[in-house]
């Protein structure tokens, strides 16, 4: 699942040694070039590599219309099916729903530009099997899967063994939210409440707070305020203005409010297992 697709997306995928065949869904937060213009090229490359199956593109209507026109010209006979899912700028959509993951949208505040964020919620996991107790109570193999989802076990003599005796609590489900371009907004805090990891843009530091407001962006301090208000586990800052030589002021501002803040770096991998 690829979230936003700037012109450097293919290069980043190659550096990370990600196979093109792994791209099944592309989520586009808004139609500014640094988030969208790499997508036509990526779709063409997928066809060139004869990737099969289906790629679902989740995008606003003008972007879908443009993609259809471009693909009709440069790659009209793709090796895979492209399924377009039109996004609602008001948010509130479920754009992906599998047995293990749900992806929903929420509205961002990026000036006059329609823009949404994405929230990824892992679905509740099954309970862990207590092998010693399962063997002790001689639970048949074909009954074990039902134990994972809360079923009790009834012995041949009618004795009921409670599920809690045979299982251990499940691993906590994880969640992640992505806020691409947005001004400070309490509604965003509501949308990302309780996630384990929040990516939030921090284009400016407080020295350019007025510019951030004018351009529909946030400062690092504002991003941390959103994260703290939402009770997130960790804040990941990105989308920094090129007017800064480094991100030291961003990190310092944010950590004054939320110490568990880190800076996004090219090629970074973050595990939620320890969150």
Regions inferred by a protein language model and the residue ranges of each:
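Active-site neighborhood of phospho(di)ester-bond hydrolases with catalytic His/Asp-centered motifs
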Residues: 3-6, 23-31, 60, 177-182, ...
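Conserved catalytic cores of phosphodiester-cleaving nucleases, focusing on short active-site segments
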Residues: 1-3, 103
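A glycine-rich helix N-cap at a beta->alpha junction
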Residues: 74-88
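Short active-site oxyanion
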Residues: 1, 53-56, 174-176
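Binuclear metal-ion centers of metallo-dependent hydrolases, dominated by the metallo-beta-lactamase
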Residues: 87, 91-92, 184-275
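Active-site metal-binding motif and surrounding structural segment of the metallo-beta-lactamase
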Residues: 7-58, 86-88
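Active-site-proximal loop/helix segment associated with metal-binding centers of metalloenzymes
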Residues: 96-178, 182-191, 197
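Metal-dependent catalytic neighborhoods of phosphoester/phosphodiester hydrolases
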Residues: 39-46, 70, 245-255
